UniProtKB/Swiss-Prot annotation:
The gene is PRE1. Belongs to the peptidase T1B family. One of its GO terms (molecular function) is endopeptidase activator activity. It is found in: Cytoplasm; Nucleus. This is Proteasome subunit beta type-4.
Length: 198
């Protein structure tokens, strides 16, 4: 029951992921970070089967960083998302497919604009203004549809994210231990340490 949310605003992308790691009715960890920094301006959040998510995320992170070192070139968020989509598409045709859904948020330095991509475990990729995986989509898409504007500032995006998290806390039968929120903009990736949904 992982929660990952992404919102693209005027000059950044905001990604939020639940802190809880659960198995059945047990909470195994209450401070898990379900994101990986793939490059200085690209962040991936992931949800899915416990073993698959971490293994896949580390594999993607290592390969993107290896490419950057070999070629001395930072891949754009679009190029990173295409690589991730290709790996998931290859995986689904193997004997041991990854059961991983991802959101990739980044800032393209050449185009000077933020980008958000949603990719599911079948290798379907789409660029969106906002996205969610897991049960979070059922409860938050109506809020996002109603309140989202492409010209929102980062602060307005964080306020919209607070509305979404409040709705999840009210509607979901489980405690997901809050969310870790990260912002990707022209200056890089930073974590929002004082994010409170109340």
């Amino acid at each position: 029951m992982d929660i990952i949310l992404g919102i693209r605003v005027q000059d950044s992308v905001i990604l939020a992921s639940s802190k809880a790691v659960t198995r059945g009715i047990s909470v195994l960890k209450d401070s898990d970070d379900k994101t990986r920094q793939l490059s200085p301006h690209t962040l991936m959040s992931f949800a899915g089967e416990a073993g698959d998510t971490v293994q896949f995320a580390e594999y993607i992170q290592a390969n993107i960083q290896l490419y950057s070192i070999r070629e001395d070139y930072e891949l754009s968020p679009q190029a990173v998302s295409s690589f991730v989509r290709q790996e998931l598409a290859k995986s689904i045709r193997s004997r041991r497919p990854y059961q991983v859904n991802v959101l990739i948020g980044g800032y393209d330095k050449k185009k000077n604009k933020p980008e958000l991509y949603q990719i599911d475990y079948l290798g379907t990729k789409v660029e969106l203004p906002y996205g969610a995986h897991g049960y979070s989509g059922f409860y938050t898409f109506s809020l996002l549809d109603h309140h989202y504007r492409p010209d929102m500032t980062t602060e307005e995006g964080l306020d919209l994210l607070k509305l979404c998290v409040q709705e999840l806390e009210k509607r979901m039968p489980m405690d997901f231990k809050g969310v870790i929120v990260k912002i990707v903009d022209k200056d890089g990736i930073r974590q929002v340490d004082d994010f409170q949904a109340q």
